[in-house]
UniProtKB/Swiss-Prot annotation:
Top EC group: lyase
InterPro entries: Ferrochelatase, Ferrochelatase_AS, Ferrochelatase_C, Ferrochelatase_N
Protein encoded by which gene: hemH
First and last residue of the signal peptide: none
Protein name: Ferrochelatase
Highest taxon, organism lineage: Bacteria
Species this chain originates from: Pasteurella multocida (strain Pm70)
GO MF entry, a single one: ferrochelatase activity
UniProt family annotation: Belongs to the ferrochelatase family.
Role played: Catalyzes the ferrous insertion into protoporphyrin IX.
GO biological process terms held by the UniProt record: heme biosynthetic process
Length: 326
C-alpha cells in the first residue's frame, strides 16, 4: 500500500437537483453566469438572462430533464458515481492508497464540498480529473477556475496535478472503438457529434475543434471506415452567435437527401450520458432524421461505467501519479 494518500477529484459539468423549473433555473444561473461559458459583458448579459432567458428556458428544459430522470435521479450524477465506485473498487483491489470523490463544476456536489471531504480523509496530494477528453476553455478551463477559486481560500495548498485532456489516449480510443463495434452496422453512416462552442472562442485560441478531429481520425483509423461512411458535427448550440459547424441537427435533417438512410450517432466528448445525449441526440435528433426520410437511427451510448472506460480512467490517474513521484 502506498504511504502517501492521493485524492482524486472526478469532475463533470453538473446537473440540477431535480427536474423542476425552480431547480433548473438555479442551476442554469450558475452555469450561464460563468464567463468561461458566456463571456458577454455582465451588465448586458445578467438582466437578459434573469429577465427573459431563464424564465422561458427553465420551463422547457424541465420537461426535457423529466423525460430522462430516473428513480436514482440525474443520469449524469448517477453514472459519475458509478464511475467513482468502480474506480475506488479497482484501486482497493490494486492496494493503491487513492480516494476518489465526485465533483461538479456547477450544482452539487460542488468542487468545494468534494475537496472538504478529501480533506477530512487527510489526503497528501490531489489529482483533478475533468471528464472531458477534448480540452475546451468552457469545460476543462472552467474546472480549473472553480478549483483555483477554492485554493484561494486555503493557506495550506496541497500538491496537485491536473489532467488536461486525453483525446488521443490509446485506452480511450480503444474503448470508443469497442463500443462502436458492439453497436454499429456496416450499412450505417457513423456520425461523431460533439458539444459545440462559439466560433469566436476558437478564434480566441480555443483548440477544441482540433482535439475533436484528432479523436475522430484516431477512431476511424482503427475502424477502417472510408470517407463516405462517417461524419463529424457539433450539437447543443444556443443563442444567435455562430458556433462550430456543421450543426448536428442540420446534418441529420439533410442526410437522407444525400442517400444516407441509416444513421448511428456517438458522442465521444461525453464521459457519461446526460441531457445532451439521452434527450437531444437519442430523442430529438432521431425525430429530425426520421422526419426527413431516414429509415433507421441509433444512438451509441457514452462509455459511462464500461470496464474499458474505468480501466482507462484508472490508468490515466496512475500514470499521472507515477509522473509526479519521479
Amino acid at each position: 500500500m502506498n504511504k502517501a494518500k492521493t485524492g482524486v477529484l472526478l469532475v463533470n459539468l453538473g446537473t440540477p437537483e431535480s427536474p423542476t423549473p425552480k431547480a433548473i433555473s438555479r442551476y442554469l444561473w450558475q452555469f450561464l453566469t460563468d464567463p468561461r461559458v458566456v463571456d458577454l459583458p455582465r451588465y448586458k448579459w445578467f438582466p437578459l438572462l434573469k429577465g427573459i432567458i431563464l424564465p422561458l428556458r427553465a420551463k422547457r428544459v424541465a420537461k426535457n430533464y423529466a423525460s430522462i430522470w430516473t428513480e436514482q435521479g440525474s443520469p449524469l450524477l448517477t453514472i459519475t458515481r458509478e464511475q467513482q465506485h468502480a474506480l475506488q473498487t479497482y484501486f482497493k483491489q490494486q492496494e493503491k492508497n487513492i480516494v476518489v470523490e465526485v465533483a461538479m463544476t456547477y450544482g452539487e456536489p460542488s468542487i468545494k464540498s468534494a475537496m472538504q471531504r478529501l480533506s477530512t480523509q487527510q489526503v497528501d496530494n490531489l489529482i483533478v480529473f475533468p471528464l472531458y477528453p477534448q480540452y475546451s476553455s468552457s469545460t476543462t478551463g472552467a474546472v480549473f477556475d472553480a478549483f483555483a477559486q477554492v485554493l484561494k481560500t486555503q493557506r495550506g495548498v496541497l500538491p496537485f496535478d491536473f489532467i488536461h485532456s486525453y483525446h488521443t489516449n490509446e485506452d480511450y480510443i480503444a474503448a470508443l472503438v469497442t463500443t462502436i463495434q458492439e453497436h454499429f452496422q456496416p450499412d450505417e453512416f457513423l456520425l461523431f457529434s460533439f458539444h459545440g462552442i462559439p466560433v469566436r472562442y476558437e478564434n480566441m485560441g480555443d483548440y477544441y475543434r482540433e482535439h475533436c478531429k484528432q479523436t475522430v481520425l484516431a477512431v476511424i483509423d482503427r475502424l477502417g471506415l472510408t470517407e463516405n461512411q462517417w461524419g463529424l458535427s457539433f450539437q447543443s448550440r444556443f443563442g444567435k452567435e455562430e458556433w462550430l459547424q456543421p450543426y448536428t441537427d442540420q446534418f441529420l435533417a439533410q442526410a437522407p437527401s444525400q442517400n444516407i438512410q441509416k444513421m448511428a450517432v456517438i458522442c465521444p466528448g461525453f464521459a457519461a450520458d446526460c441531457l445532451e445525449t439521452l434527450e437531444e441526440i437519442e430523442e430529438e435528433n432521431k425525430e429530425i432524421f426520421l422526419a426527413n426520410g431516414g429509415i433507421s437511427y441509433r444512438y451509441i451510448p457514452a462509455l459511462n461505467a464500461r470496464p474499458e472506460h474505468i480501466q482507462m480512467m484508472a490508468n490515466l490517474i496512475l500514470n499521472k501519479l507515477n509522473q509526479t513521484s519521479k
